[in-house]
Structure formats: structure tokens, C-alpha cells
Swiss-Prot record:
Protein name (Swiss-Prot/TrEMBL): Uncharacterized transporter CE2102
Main location: membrane
Single annotated GO MF: monoatomic cation transmembrane transporter activity
InterPro entries: AAE_transporter, RCK_C, RCK_C_sf, YidE_YbjL
Length: 542
């Protein structure tokens, strides 16, 4: 192992590579995914405590991960605040308060040192800023004896390092076990929540009602997840694309695009099904086009339509998901849009949207760097708390907060904050892998000493118990009592723990966006709540 001690880069690459390989192997029916990198790092540093990874790797990886998550989830996050955000945050906050109260009772009963108990809670809740806040608060609460002060300041750090690894593993195992016990069907959950990957098709419908709203308003006013892409009218030889304000007439044949379930509803509300191929007209054509022109990004489709008269965006493919185009939606770099237009204007449509895969790969990095810099600066800001300590969002909370704001904005003038979907996923995966490899090497020495120290084993055991408590509380109350989809509930738990490895695991298991929605909806409040909870616990114990 000496070669890894001497070469930190080799150690980092080896931990990442072995962890990613092990993460693809199934153990007892589930895979750890990228979370396996954490445990490989822990194993390396337990065997040889001198194996280290530069702290900057941990910071950069964490900042990259949360920033790319925030960019992708920004718009949905602020939309959720008006619907499910209060519910999700109430669940997370209640679980943190309950776990802190249980920790106080257990620590008092076992007679653990206050600094050790507070550090143990931060490890069980896997929150580094909370541990740092405890260390910051200690000098004002202990005697002036330098020897005692130095020893006491080490206690929360040691307790944190002992409880942190199981603080991750217990959560992942609890999610895996509860998912099996609850017989979770992730695909069905995603479909019910409207985030599933669904195949979109077209169907011809003859209008038999004379009281329908304007064609562009049909989806909203009739609560249909569809779009009308073409109209056939008696007396007109060709199909035409409906413009803003156009209305239907009796006997019109509409080409309606949507999922099978929504198309069944549309037929019932609009008229009757008409047999025949919906795209048979030779004068109208369609094409899938890559969005690589930045001028088309971050602008609502309702406004964008003025730039493409006579054309219609009917579908947007983002990642593996096909979405029906809605007036309030915005395009992102890398989206694959389906455009309906007169056959002679298809080439013009291709030019308007860019359709350059090479240009996508050569995206502008300046907004990414500026956004990350703003996030780090916000994370450095300190907010005073009672007792002389201060609260800061750190290198996770700051970038996440800024990313959520920029992701919701999409663009500022000519600056596009979003990055291509594929680049976002690549940076996200790289960031979480770097973070887990680095953080895993920090706790090995403490784990090694714990193997022969009964007191350390007690701290590990109690920390694991606290982690189990908060995991069960969130999963059972969230899914069984509050009827939140299990994938979203597990995401809420990952956000409550503020640990990306948990999110990565459940996202890989569910293969939909529900976990990310739950994670981003509670992460900022959970980060602040745990920092305050750890310090309050310390004050109550002393």
C-alpha cells in the first residue's frame, strides 16, 4: 500500500475505479452504485491510515455535484414550494428535531461527554458543517486550560469520524429494506407522478363539439397533457399548423400528440377517433433537432413561437424522457425537439435551433465558473448565532442555493446558466465520485482504533441507532402516513441527511426524477436545521 501513500493521485484514481466497479455488483438484491466509492476509500485508509487525498478534491467534488443538481432541479424546486415544498420540509424538520431529542436522552443516559455527543449526532446525520459549528462553539463553553481545550476540541471530530460511515450505510440499507417491505414499484410511482419515461404517439380525432376553446388553450382548459400539432379541415386540401387564437370547427380532424392514457381522455373530450396515419400529409413534415443555439434557451415556448412563425414544437426529449411541449416550458442546451413545419422550411428550422452536436460539446464554461464562484462566496458568508458562534452554508449549501436560483432563471440576458444535459450528468457523476473517494479516506484511522476500543464501539453503535431512527421516521411517516411516493420520500431522506451518496443510490435504483425532487426540496432547510440542532444539543448537554 506504500505506493498509494506516496502518490495521492494514484490513490484517488484507484479508489474511484475500484469503487465504481464494486458499485455495479449486486449484493443481496441491491447495488451500492457510486456510494461504493465511499466504502472503498474507508477500507483503504483503515488498512493504511497514511493514505490521504487532498482536501481540495473533496471540496471541488462536493461543489460540482450539488451545483449540477441545483441547476437541473431549480425550476421544479421553486414550483414545488407552492405545492409540496412545505409538506416535505415539515417532514424533514420534524425528523431532525425528533432525532436530536432522542440523542439528548441517550447521551444523558450513557453519560457521554457533551462534545462527543454533539459530534456523534453530526456524524449520524452526516453533516460536516454541523460538526464544524460544534467545534466553533466549544471555545466559548470550555475552561481556559490549553491542554483540556485541545483535548475537548478533538472529541467532536473523532466522534464524527466514527459515526459518519455508518451514517451513510445505514440509510442506504434502510431504503433498500423498506423498498422491499413496501413492495415499491418505481416505474408506477413515476408514472402516477407524471415524471415517468412515456412513449408519445399521435392520434387523429374528429371534433364533434362546437364549444371547445381556442386550440392552443385546449390542453390547459381541459386538463389534458397533449398538444394539437395539425388540423385537417373540410374544403382545404392540406393540413395546417394551428396558430395562436385559431378555433376548431365541427368535423375538423386534429392530430393530437400525447401518451396513450392522455390520448384516450382527449378522444372522449374532443370527439371521436379517426383511423389513418396522423402524419400522412406531404406538405407538412417534422424533424428531431438538437438545441445548440443559446438564443433559443431559457425562453418560454409561448414567446419563442413568435420567432418561428408557421412552425410548432410538439415534443421535447430531455435525457431519456419525452415531454409534451407547453407554453410555459423553456428549452435547455442539448434538448432534442420535434418540430412540425412545412416541408420546405425544415432546413430553416434546423438552422434556427442549431442542430450541432459538436457545438453542444463545446459549450460555454464561463457561466458554470461564475455560478460556482458565486455559490462558494455565498457559502463563506457567516450569520451570527447566539453564544458567539456563526452559521454558514459552506461549500455544499452555497453552491446549491445559487444553482437553484440560476436553474430557475435559466438565463440572464445573453448569459445562459444551464449546461447541456449530458454535460450536467457527467460533471455530477465526476463530482460525487471525487467527493466520496476523498471523504472515505478521512475516517479510516478512527475506524481502525475503534476495533480495539469499547468506548469507540459504543459511539459507533449509538450513532448507527440515531441514523436508523431518522431513516425509519422519514420513510415510514412520509410514505405510509403522508402518502408521498417512496422515491420522493427516499429523496427527502437523502436531503435530510444532506448526503449525495444516498441520493445517488436511490436515483440509480428508481431511474426517475422523484428522488432529486425530494432531495432539492429539503436540502437547504435541512442543512441549516442540522447546524442549529447540533449546537442546541451541545448547549443543552453542558
Amino acid at each position: 500500500m506504500s505506493i498509494f501513500v506516496e502518490n495521492q493521485l494514484l490513490a484517488l484514481v484507484a479508489i474511484m475505479g475500484i469503487g465504481l466497479l464494486l458499485g455495479r455488483i449486486r449484493f443481496f438484491g441491491f447495488r451500492l452504485g457510486v456510494a461504493a466509492v465511499l466504502f472503498v476509500g474507508l477500507a483503504f485508509s483503515t488498512i493504511e491510515p497514511d493514505i490521504t487525498v487532498p482536501p481540495l478534491i473533496y471540496v471541488v467534488g462536493l461543489a460540482l455535484f450539488v451545483y449540477t443538481i441545483g441547476l437541473e432541479a431549480g425550476r421544479d424546486f421553486f414550483r414545488s414550494l407552492r405545492s409540496t415544498g412545505l409538506r416535505n420540509n415539515g417532514l424533514a424538520l420534524g425528523a431532525i428535531i425528533a432525532t436530536t431529542a432522542i440523542a439528548w436522552v441517550v447521551i444523558k443516559a450513557l453519560g457521554l461527554a457533551p462534545a462527543t455527543g454533539a459530534g456523534m449526532l453530526t456524524g449520524a446525520l452526516t453533516n460536516t458543517p454541523a460538526m464544524a459549528a460544534v467545534v466553533d462553539a466549544l471555545p466559548a463553553l470550555i475552561d481556559d486550560n490549553p491542554t483540556d481545550a485541545a483535548r475537548i476540541l478533538e472529541l467532536p471530530v473523532v466522534a464524527y469520524s466514527l459515526t459518519y460511515p455508518l451514517g451513510v450505510l445505514v440509510v442506504i440499507l434502510t431504503i433498500a429494506v423498506c423498498g422491499g417491505l413496501f413492495k415499491v414499484n418505481h416505474e408506477k410511482e413515476a408514472k402516477n407522478a407524471g415524471v415517468a419515461v412515456q412513449e408519445l404517439t399521435g392520434r387523429r380525432v374528429r371534433v364533434t363539439r362546437d364549444d371547445l376553446p381556442a386550440i392552443s388553450n385546449i390542453p390547459e382548459l381541459l386538463d389534458l397533457e397533449v398538444i394539437v400539432s395539425r388540423v385537417e379541415r373540410r374544403g382545404q386540401h392540406d393540413q395546417f399548423i394551428p396558430e395562436e387564437g385559431d378555433r376548431t370547427r365541427l368535423g375538423d380532424i386534429l392530430t393530437v400528440v400525447g401518451s396513450d392514457d392522455e390520448l384516450e381522455r382527449a378522444v372522449g373530450l374532443l370527439g371521436e377517433f379517426v383511423d389513418g396515419h396522423p402524419y400522412s400529409d406531404i406538405d407538412l413534415d417534422y424533424r428531431r433537432i438538437f438545441v445548440s443555439d443559446e438564443s433559443m434557451v431559457g425562453v418560454p415556448l409561448a414567446k419563442l413561437r413568435n420567432r418561428i412563425p408557421g412552425m410548432l414544437i410538439t415534443r421535447i426529449r430531455r435525457g431519456d424522457t419525452d415531454l409534451i411541449a407547453h407554453p410555459d416550458m423553456t428549452l435547455q442546451l442539448g434538448d432534442l425537439v420535434r418540430v412540425v413545419a412545412p416541408a420546405e422550411r425544415i432546413k430553416e428550422a434546423t438552422h434556427i435551433f442549431g442542430d450541432s452536436y459538436k457545438r453542444l460539446a463545446d459549450f460555454n464554461l464561463v457561466p458554470l465558473v461564475v455560478g460556482l464562484s458565486l455559490g462558494v462566496l455565498v457559502g463563506m458568508m457567516e450569520f451570527p448565532l447566539p453564544g458567539g458562534s456563526a452559521l454558514s452554508l459552506g461549500n455544499a449549501g452555497g453552491p446549491l442555493l445559487i444553482a437553484l436560483l440560476l436553474g430557475a432563471m435559466g438565463r440572464t440576458g445573453k448569459v445562459v446558466w444551464q449546461i447541456p444535459y449530458s454535460a450536467n450528468l457527467a460533471l455530477r457523476q465526476l463530482g460525487i465520485t471525487m467527493f466520496l473517494a476523498a471523504i472515505g479516506t478521512t475516517a479510516g484511522a478512527g475506524f481502525r482504533s475503534a476495533l480495539s476500543d469499547p468506548a469507540s464501539l459504543l459511539i459507533i453503535g449509538v450513532g448507527a441507532l440515531l441514523t436508523l431512527v431518522i431513516s425509519v421516521l422519514v420513510l415510514v411517516i412520509g410514505h405510509k402516513v403522508m402518502r408521498i411516493p417512496f422515491g420522493e420520500t427516499a429523496g427527502i431522506l437523502a436531503g435530510t441527511q444532506t448526503h449525495p451518496a444516498v441520493l445517488s443510490y436511490i436515483s440509480e435504483a428508481s431511474r426517475n426524477e422523484l428522488p432529486a425532487m425530494g432531495y432539492t426540496s429539503v436540502y437547504p432547510l435541512a442543512m441549516v436545521a442540522k447546524i442549529i440542532a447540533a449546537q442546541v444539543l451541545l448547549f443543552l448537554l453542558i
